[in-house]
Amino acid sequence: MRYDPSLIEEKWQKFWKEEQTFRAEEDETKTKYYVLDMFPYPSGAGLHVGHLIGYTATDIVARYKRAKGFSVLHPMGWDSFGLPAEQYAIRTGTHPRETTEKNIANFKQQLTSMGFSYDESREFATSDPEYYKWTQKLFLILYEKGLAYMADMAVNYCPELGTVLSNEEVENGFSVEGGYPVERRMLRQWVLRITAFADQLLGGLDELDWPESVKQLQRNWIGKSVGASVHFETEHGVLEVFTTRPDTLIGVSFLVLAPEHPLVDLLTSDEQKTIVAQYVKETQSKSERDRISEMKTKSGVFTGAYAKHPVTQNPIPIWIADYVLMGYGSGAVMGVPAHDDRDLLFAQQFDLPIISVVSEDGVCINSCHEDFSLDGLSGEEAKQYVINFLEKNNLGSAKVAYKLRDWLFSRQRYWGEPIPVIHFEDGSCRPLKDDELPLLPPEIQDYRPEGVGQGPLAKVKEWVNVFDSETQKEGKRETHTMPQWAGSCWYYLRFCDAHNSCAPWAEEKEQYWMPVDLYIGGAEHAVLHLLYARFWHQVFYEAGIVSTPEPFKKLVNQGLVLSTSYRIPGKGYIAPEMAKEENGQWISPSGELLDVRQEKMSKSKLNGVDPKVLIDEFGADAVRMYAMFSGPLDKNKLWSNQGVAGCRRFLNRFYEMATSSRVKDEDIFEGMSLAHKLVQRVTDDIEKLSLNTITSSFMEFINEFVKLPVYPKNAVEMAVRALAPIAPHISEELWVLLGNASGIEKAGWPKALPEYLEGKIVTIVVQVNGKLRARLDISKDAIEEEVVALAKEAVSKYLEGGVVRKTIFVLNRLVNFVI
């Protein structure tokens, strides 16, 4: 029989859909397993090979766990709000909803063609009003707890896009989306008080089964620093400075303020006002990421003002520099160039004093003044001495600071969740009640923002201006919308109870499914999405509406998919099919020498691979197998279409083997042993997520198995069941062809038995007058008398009417009866 994936795959995809094979149930008699992909933004480009890696991995685990008897939740949805759809709407006039629905339909078809076992009954998009009704409700929980507030904030503002951008949406002073100039402005924004949960967010990391690199990124992002607040007296009052090194206090030779510091105008001398104002303006065009990047030179300007050193009373010059950020500590730092690399660069740039106060072995030196003395103390001893001194003299105190800033939550966009608040002229506001949700945006034709700091919603006066029946006052609806992060902060909870119209989730369903047992997605989400989701979850946990302190038990980041790119230096990339190899070098059609690299797949580099093309040529099962075989799940991997072809050839061989006339109802030990060993290896690989070695295990199995004169049917069935998680279509087909009922997962996961793994069973040949009459699987340790008795019983019909004149016995090999 010939293996034709185009017929097999469509057939079984239809079967799974009609039978609702993957519908999850809250079955209290079963152990639950919740496996989740980081759901995608439904872009127009659709599914790419990078998606395949993570999605195939979670699907293998989901299918395996179902076969093992778990109640499995494996859902998929759409992170569908966002800037790209809105920008497309501005360019074309197409409503973002229309674009999004079209893209989702395309994405769904592609996912179906890969045979992913999602519970389609739980599907939703974050832009569905039925979903964002609850996003709005959860925002109001944060508001009621004082965790959502409005404040004037220094933000990244893009005039061309007309909206505020996060630091991650800005690169080298330009927006990632569109490449437009970005500037710093003070705008009134909604902010979430994530800093109130800094300690919980830090502490919770220790209990998570996450990559250590991700946990460290979050620790660094939160940036807990233990130190001291030091008060430096100026002509205009006390200047508070935070330091993690109070032991170096005597080594201070200058102070540096962030350009946004509220005392800048007050402290700046008349002679320096023009140059300081110019510097502050220049800083506004830089993102915070640019400002704190490691550079060999530092910029800054002297204010003309001085502060008194709290110990020596010496005058300390006060400077302004963009490497100091207002959101960390107090927005002011003390410059100790002898013991801080950034301070050293700054001091060298502006010829400021460098005073060494700590020896190479960490002991304080040159740190005496009157009754103040640190000399000879270790770093920790000196820190405590200084803190005691500061507190005793009302010059400061011990302090803990965080790099983490409150989360800027406003966006001046149309395609996002409207913030459910009404504002009044007296400055007060009213959060909407549950029966007023969802707050829907109005239908509009022009998606461009309305002036600085105002989104497109501000244009629709009949929507903005309302008479509030609750307060009997005229009010205005909030015209800012939530960021794309809002919907993805809690979507994993909605999957527990996706279509509940009375609550975001039912308590008993959340308690059954949470936490997520396995969460797979890209490392680019290591901080923001994962940190924001943990923040919301911990708020909910503190409020008593979720049962677990953390949302994601185990996290795995899949590696990047690389592909060969071909570039004409100084010109650009060409398609791979246009490049040709000559004498070990790659040449363009016009004869130019090409720069050949392995780079991340992208449209711009022309090195992407369309999954549909691969599926049409090789079949989804072959693509799935190669997606895992290409390399360890968490490592970068080089894609090769030849590798997919190799997996297709393997599936051809496997299909031929399983449908061969050599498949017999005979449990030959060699065949059973190969099958049991295969099952054990595949089981171990899936449990350890070493999914790249599964394919090689199958290849080794079939190479040995086809050497057998007979293929034991039980062994073939075991191999087919073990193949099902990674190549489900061919496995379902073969399972039926072997005489079983449809639905291979119902057969359960095959169990590897020790006797077949440890070599304690051997297969012996039983002959009569030298002719093969039977095979027996017996214990390796069986004595001769026992083996002969079993052999005689197995060939009794051939011995009838004759007399056994001689019995030839070869240990663990054969018994031959001569009659």
UniProtKB/Swiss-Prot annotation:
Q: Does the keyword Cytoplasm apply?
A: yes
Biological process GO annotation list? Answer: leucyl-tRNA aminoacylation
What does it catalyze?
A: tRNA(Leu) + L-leucine + ATP = L-leucyl-tRNA(Leu) + AMP + diphosphate
- Which Gene Ontology cellular-component terms appear in the entry? cytosol
Q: Where does ATP bind?
A: 603
Motif 'KMSKS' region, per the record, lies over 600-604
Family to which the UniProt record says this protein belongs: Belongs to the class-I aminoacyl-tRNA synthetase family.
Output this protein's name.
Answer: Leucine--tRNA ligase
Organism per entry: Chlamydia muridarum (strain MoPn / Nigg)
Gene designation: leuS
